[in-house]
Amino acid sequence: MFKFGDEKGQLKCSFCGKSQEQVRKLVAGPGVYICDECIELCNEIIEEELNDDVEFNLNNIPKPREIKKILDQYVVGQERAKKSLSVAVYNHYKRVNSDMKIDDVELQKSNILMVGPTGCGKTLLAQTLARILDVPFAITDATSLTEAGYVGEDVENILLKLIQAADYDIEKAERGIIYIDEIDKIARKSENPSITRDVSGEGVQQALLKILEGTVASVPPQGGRKHPHQEFIQIDTTNILFIAGGAFDGLDKIIKSRIDNKVMGFGADIKSKTEENVGETLKYILPEDLLRYGLIPEFIGRLPVIVTLNELVEEDLVKILTEPRNALVKQYKKFFEMDNVELEFTPEALTAIAQKALERNTGARGLRAVVEEAILDIMYDLPSEPGIAKCVITPEVIKNHKNPELIRVKDKEETA
């Protein structure tokens, strides 16, 4: 058994055995003593282990199949898009983990452009990827950006959002993901270079080039415009993954017109396929189509990985309501469960919700609004109504704002 004191009665550290006189401090615990030197050593060991845990290395990068498997839990459909993103993200972080040069082969940066209709899951895919990889993530809207010197946000402000998401840990931020939404809104107004200044279109594309490619950017710590007498945060964007997304309304017509010009060979076959829907047409996208849409060649070159997403149909929306881990129906059931009420949506009610969202042309993001409108009154009254055991949502509740079927505790006991 360890002695806490020597023959003279002096107290000793229970870990290193040094006496009270040999150390600066001796901290007492229940039946144990520890000196300041041992405390310092313990802190160093813990700090090293924490640093080892957060260090990003190849062994910690999930494989493409693993990434897609997690994406499947949150995003319904879009199989090809999920595969493409899984591979692109895996390759990006392999490049980050290497020295970007392997046997004199330079690994170039592969930013991603996501093209798909409104509400098809572009933002959700980017958010989920960041969660899987446990890296800082920031979303910005391209429509708020303007060329330096004009009213609006400088492009450097998108980096500030990432730095804030990383709690101002610059090293961590330099390996994060930035999602730029509404990227199609900064297309220039015409295919030909403009004589007049296009401060929110081509000007922004030009301003984004360096950041997308990789540069050491100076970011104002408080955001807003730069001025000469302020301090800046320096951040290297070389290893930041940029994902740009947009609906690109009208791009399908540009693709169709290109395909329609090919009247021979495989052209006729492709044409028949593209008549199906916008998502099918977008599969045949080429950089030249984006050029005609209004993106400048240099900007297209900085987004080499193009991922297209399909339009969501009724069946997809019903699955989105019920299948993902964060599905709306599961969330509302949980809320009702907290009031000891069982919530049930009939299959016909789910179809009615999907149809209403499609009518509004809002995609998956419109589902919550439809459900909220339909069950707002019952969510308001239910907590004050004792004795209700079950609430059944029927198509009439969704379509005509009728009251849901309420089953009280007594009725449930009688039918049991």
Curated annotation (Swiss-Prot):
UniProt entry keywords in alphabetical sequence: ATP-binding, Chaperone, Metal-binding, Nucleotide-binding, Zinc
Organism: Halothermothrix orenii (strain H 168 / OCM 544 / DSM 9562)
Coiled-coil region(s): none
Gene: clpX
Protein's name in the database: ATP-dependent Clp protease ATP-binding subunit ClpX
Gene Ontology CC annotations of this record: HslUV protease complex
CDD domains, per the entry: RecA-like_ClpX
BP terms from Gene Ontology: cell division; proteolysis involved in protein catabolic process
Ranges of residues in domain ClpX-type ZB: 1-54
GO terms for MF: ATP binding; ATP hydrolysis activity; ATP-dependent protein folding chaperone; protein dimerization activity; unfolded protein binding; zinc ion binding
Assembly and binders: Component of the ClpX-ClpP complex. Forms a hexameric ring that, in the presence of ATP, binds to fourteen ClpP subunits assembled into a disk-like structure with a central cavity, resembling the structure of eukaryotic proteasomes.
SUPFAM superfamilies on file: Glucocorticoid receptor-like (DNA-binding domain) (SSF57716), P-loop containing nucleoside triphosphate hydrolases (SSF52540)
Residue positions binding ATP: P117, T118, G119, C120, G121, K122, T123, L124
